[in-house]
Amino acid sequence: MSVVERRQINAAINLRLSLLGLPHPDSNAESPDAILVEPLLARQRELSRRLKDRLSAPDLRIQRFLDDYLADCDEHPQLPRTTLVLDEPGLARGLSLPVDGDEFHSDIVASYRLVNGVLHNPKHDRRTTAGVFHISTGGLPIPQDKVEVDKNVYARILARAFQAPDEELALPYTANLPEQAHCWASLLMRPTVLPAVPGRTTEKSYEVHFIVPGGLMCNLDFVEGIFGNAGDPYLPENDASLDPDSWTGHTGCVILAPHLTTMTKKSLGMPHYDDATERQRRDGQCWRHEDDLYNDGKAFKVCARDERGVIVTVIADNYFGYCKKEVKTQISYSANLLGGAEEEHSGGAEVYPAWNLNQDFTDRTPDDFTLADVISTNRELLDVRPEGYAVYKPEPNIVFIPEHSHYSMRTQTISWTAHGAEQTIKLLAGKHYLSPDGYRIHAKHREMDATQWHLIGTSSRAVTCHKPATVSGGGKSEISKSISDAFVFGNAFSHDIDSAMDQVQALFDTDFTNRFADASRNGTDHRPVLSIDRSLGSVIKLLTPSIQYNDEYNAFLEGIEPDVKELAFTVKRYYLPEWGEDWRSHFTVGIMNGRHGNMVRLDGKKIITNMLRVGFREDGSWRLFTLRPDYSPAVKVQTEDDITASTVTPPWEDAEGLPRKYVTNCEHLLFQRPDDAIHRGYDKQAEFDLASGTDTFISNFEPLTHEQARDLLTDVQAYSEFTKPVRKLIERVAAMPDDQSPEFWVCSDDPRHLPDGGRSKNPRYLQVRPTDSNPELTTVADVAGKLARKLPLAGHAPQPIDVVAAGRRNNPPEDKVPALCAYNPLHYMELPELFMEYISSMTGKSPSTTGAGSEGALTKGPFNALPAVYDLNAALLSYALTDYDGWLSSAGYIGPNARVDHDISMLIPELFSHMGPNDRNTKRLISEGYLEKMQDFDFDGHRVLASRLGYRINDRFVTHYFGRIFLHPDVVFSEEMLRPELQDEKIFADSIDVIVKTHQRVAQMYFDDGTVSLACPPIRALLEIMAHGASAEGWTLDSPEFRKLFERESVLASDWYAQRLDAKQAEDVKQAEEGVERLKEYIGRSDSGSVTGRLHLADRLRELEAQLTYERSPEYRQSLVGTLGRQPRFV
């Protein structure tokens, strides 16, 4: 924050403190400005005093809910009537630190103003999930995995939440003033619940009001960064009820109250252990000793909620993660009550495959795409140049090039024919050149040699990957990270160039026509290796062993030395037809000490190769594999990170197409944990983020002084290991005098020092969403995608999900952590097996968890205020209606011996981006032998139910599809990785037993709490099979009648799906009716005239009445077919 911005924020803060009559730095100021506005402020304070009992619109909704919900209780808690309202972004940041200082300390938080942002270290450096989530009785069913709290106890907790001690109410902003301000503070936000899909849905959000003691301004700064600021709740412009089209109809409230951990159970009216029920004893809702503390004095959160759509949560801790996850919880609550929407624990990205085009490329745009059409449709957005190309006005680095143009890096030109003559422009670095179908070309230099430039071509059609239900450590965030950070660069190598080239020539002269195992295919393929009719991919397949080839040919291939084969691929990659037979003269090695070297050169320049790590050997060394020379890392546009709002509708571009899923990221800033940043120079993104900004929200790092920066600058070894942004930060801070503000900074490799002498394992910061930090890349992708679909460049054009691939964290047996390592790199599961996986959401040992177990259905267990069965019903429809295939990728380990960390997580999006829709069709993959069905087997006297793991990829799949990325795809995954049972059959069997037992244990909970009765028929039958081995009808997992329940046609024809659609129509009608009633009531008030006109409420009312008429109609009910509908009953 600049000095000017800080002064503006401070002025705004002082004004608001003055309005509340609270002390502030200008309290005694006699400046002309202060004298001028004081009478106005005095009058406003008097008006506020007379209206002190008036609640804002959202608080009125919350208070009415509490009054009714707790009507039969002894306590009747009241919301604070006066709070410091944070009605503008940035106020919380300014209030979280002293106006005249750089640090603030209380019993529960230590805060520092930094050169690179702000640092807030709460008392507890992490959240926990065990025993934290408590729910009040009297509302919707309480899941078995949550703590059930008597409604009277909840009322007493809520009442005490508003009795914060003075030290927690003290504003950090006035901490150093002679008289400190004490108050409550509040922030209104509108997180997204339903994404907008043109012609299908409008974006809808719910409202949530955070109310916190003044000493916890940093928590409001945190959530405001992630979810935004919805303004002053007292203003009609911000009253959600006056804009029904954008509101889900639901309201949340979150109260922070860290002081509640000192309450005794007895003081809350809990029963003695001898008088308690079994559930109360299990949940710790009773006492043995009079001084027993509630929840043993540990952090907890407790909420009350019912079907009316209001949820009120008290959080007895100030760690930031609880705040974020509570909003996630409430988004999920709103999505379920609204219907037609899901909140998902998911990562995701639009993945655009890319290729290294070398130095020359001729565009092959299909004939039905022309630049003339693009210009005609988007003339107002394009600056058309006389040569016949166009520049995109909103982003001038985007240049539209005519079809069939030629790009040359050698001459640095782009040429085409227009107006009967050849036109030429200079090909510039930093520009994005788009063909009429959206194919993108840009110039790039090699990583190891800035003098070597080549062209990169990027597809205009993304494969949108969605990674839901991914357990901790399963690679949720890795799906959107660029794989290029994992590259290792080298040079093309030959230990004896003359011999190698002789062998390559012999390969080129080989007759390959009789290679097939199927004799009928022999004698049909006569294409020479260097023919323009044979691609590099075709040559890689030609020289890679395969079950399609006969034994003799496979033996021949096995006998080719790897570097000879690689040289053959290299020659093919760079071969130009004009060379004719003389390809050898272009490939040489240097002369060193009078001898041939080993680095292969093309026309005198070293040929650089890219390698990728795919796991580790047992000794810890890296498994490196050479990438195809025409492969380039996919361009990724992040679409999801953690909290996703999604919907399923018929595609907005094609009313006859299969329903598709559309998603949106609910977060503006991303709460990142840079675990690897402790290794200097390794996490380049984290080092850039933490060192380059001046306004970054940071937590659980150690505050450092200017003197420590000078010390680090002189430690040349440590200093040199950092990336450039950190080195520049160190230099800048080292040059600052000790007393210059800000007095502190943080370094990416130095997490917070804890009282026990250790370091925090949970360093955190808020990262600017990549789509916002790199808007040019986002814009280019959006424009390219619209060109490919022939859409106007203006307007919202969301892309549907193409691939669904969840992630699992695998581990070998260790201490008390059981084996969970039966998966190979990539599995496909049909819906029954997939939902067994989703229901159990098993996790092994990971950096984020303390051990093995279940993270709850769809991994939402710790963040779900509702029975998980609601989410399962909707999630099932999101697959059954869309025919999405369910993939599952592995992280951590493959089998007990093959450690892979996140290497596969990073690789899977690249794989799918190079597979077309037909390639990804699992029915075809199964029928053609690319996927292997897992079979049950007997081991050590018992049946091992391996079939629950569905299908897994095999060597044929790897050779064929990974051959689009790697030069030697057949060796990327060993046989022991593709078939983990070969590593250790006992551990493999134990892993599957753990899976089956977890299925049984987790499913049983739905019977214990009775929520199985709320499951749709397919989920109910599946839970019965998981828990008891058979459904009530006697079906097993393999019964055709059972499996038919999951088929699309069966679902569409079912009564239960029809009931969901009826329930959704009824809810929409009810909300519209209530909206009409609220608008009429407001417009009819005597004091609403100016507001009615300013907000165009009469127009809104007419639109809503027309919408209500439509929603009551049979046509609206029919339009809901293909959507998720709504849970018919919640109790």
UniProtKB/Swiss-Prot annotation:
This is PPi-type phosphoenolpyruvate carboxykinase. Belongs to the PPi-type phosphoenolpyruvate carboxykinase family. Its EC number is 4.1.1.38. Disulfide bonds: none annotated. It comes from the Bacteria. Keywords: Decarboxylase, Lyase. The keyword Lyase applies. It is an enzyme of class 4 (lyase). It comes from Propionibacterium freudenreichii subsp. freudenreichii. One of its GO terms (molecular function) is phosphoenolpyruvate carboxykinase (diphosphate) activity. The keyword Lyase applies. Monomer and trimer; forms heterotrimers with PEPCK2 and PEPCK3. It catalyses: oxaloacetate + diphosphate = phosphoenolpyruvate + phosphate + CO2. Inorganic pyrophosphate (PPi)-dependent phosphoenolpyruvate carboxykinase, which regulates the carbon flow of the central metabolism by fixing CO(2) to phosphoenolpyruvate to produce oxaloacetate. Can also produce pyruvate and diphosphate from phosphoenolpyruvate and phosphate.
